[in-house]
Amino acid sequence: MSEITLGRYLFERLKQVEVQTIFGLPGDFNLSLLDNIYEVPGMRWAGNANELNAAYAADGYARLKGMSCIITTFGVGELSALNGIAGSYAEHVGVLHVVGVPSVSSQAKQLLLHHTLGNGDFTVFHRMSSNISETTAMITDINTAPAEIDRCIRTTYVSQRPVYLGLPANLVDLTVPASLLDTPIDLSLKPNDPEAEEEVIENVLQLIKEAKNPVILADACCSRHDAKAETKKLIDLTQFPAFVTPMGKGSIDEKHPRFGGVYVGTLSSPAVKEAVESADLVLSVGALLSDFNTGSFSYSYKTKNIVEFHSDYTKIRSATFPGVQMKFALQKLLTKVADAAKGYKPVPVPSEPEHNEAVADSTPLKQEWVWTQVGEFLREGDVVITETGTSAFGINQTHFPNNTYGISQVLWGSIGFTTGATLGAAFAAEEIDPKKRVILFIGDGSLQLTVQEISTMIRWGLKPYLFVLNNDGYTIERLIHGETAQYNCIQNWQHLELLPTFGAKDYEAVRVSTTGEWNKLTTDEKFQDNTRIRLIEVMLPTMDAPSNLVKQAQLTAATNAKN
């Protein structure tokens, strides 16, 4: 095999970086490209219900596998995906967006083709995507196409941001040398500048030597930019108390003896708030300081000794060191930190949240009880996905087993995101370990935006747990504004009929309304193994919400009302 098509080259390269499932929809400008998927052993085409869901699925897949790929068609297809792509950009998720575009000659002649705006401008959609992409490429020359594909894949993986790649329909079946595949794409980070890195390390070590009450705070980009192992070792070597933010949940093992809880500014538990805010040194790893991640910007550190490790810079107090990447900086710090921290005397960390008190089995379910009890159901290795709304806030009260991966969209907050993300995560989990459980918590309102993707789960025999929190509408919106407003109401669905409606044959659908029903279901041994797709409708009062969401809603309403 001396020559292969450009389309096959793309998919062979994706397989080399462990992308095995491709998301998207067929369209006449990408059909020839899609033919090439089936030429690559081990590669599969998911085939989504719509492009928005496909983008959400690509996001969920990338969070577990490191990057993903979605394929859409020019204009109508690619624009339908952009909300999801924007979310991946905001949340630091590497998604390669491949768009099948009209032929080079059609573009040059400015033909009045379908899926265009009718003005001869074939670059307008590319320009739109450029604002939410780390880089873009529009292939026009077969000779440079392989190098451009390699550049786009590398950038997607290394930057953990979306990348746009336009492939004209007339080029995908042209051939390129197969020998190009023999040289792997370089996915390594560029080393830090040695002098800048050394200055950072020396300054951080000095702050550690002087600290009496330091803490470590892990945030979203600790996971996104692959610094979890370094952060864990930092905790082990120093024994500093360690905390996570809502977006960082799952980036530190919560059974670690030095794990102290979730810090959300003023929304934190009193013990966590005191422990973090009284620190005389904060080592922050991968911070993403958005409103819902910080309790509406209510961080209140008493110290100015704050070190921020980021994917592309490090900040020490008020001094910024551009280009000093956290992964390498942490690795260098780990070689010296034990000696610097030898004078530290460990202080107690806030204790693990207490278990629920025993109540009568007939007790109606409430949010506070459910989220504590969820921790009893989870086990090591689970992927836990929480929708924007009560789920994203309630999960902060759940104590994770070790090696649990949390997926949420706290910054972008597009409701309905998690249905597609669950599909993508389920594909990824199946490739990593078929026994790995994928567990979704989503509200009844959010589900109505993206429910079609459950049919894709069924078509592929995927087996996630779908916990649908039925609180009769948009509770998070009611808490912020319009408690009884008609616009926060939805049509109630017969949720237990969804799986058979979408064609499921081997499934379980059950409704739980009381603590006894919840406990009986979640402690059943057969239920605990992911042998089939399951939908669990959880009945909850309309205005019931986790306590931290009630507080956040008040803060958000106040912010919205400010002049």
Swiss-Prot record:
It comes from the Eukaryota. The keyword Lyase applies. It catalyses: a 2-oxocarboxylate + H(+) = an aldehyde + CO2; pyruvate + H(+) = acetaldehyde + CO2. Keywords: Decarboxylase, Lyase, Magnesium, Metal-binding, Thiamine pyrophosphate. One of its GO terms (cellular component) is nucleus. Signal peptide: none annotated. Its cofactor is Mg(2+); thiamine diphosphate. GO terms for molecular function: magnesium ion binding; pyruvate decarboxylase activity; thiamine pyrophosphate binding. It is an enzyme of class 4 (lyase). Disulfide bonds: none annotated. Homotetramer. This is Pyruvate decarboxylase. The gene is PDC1.
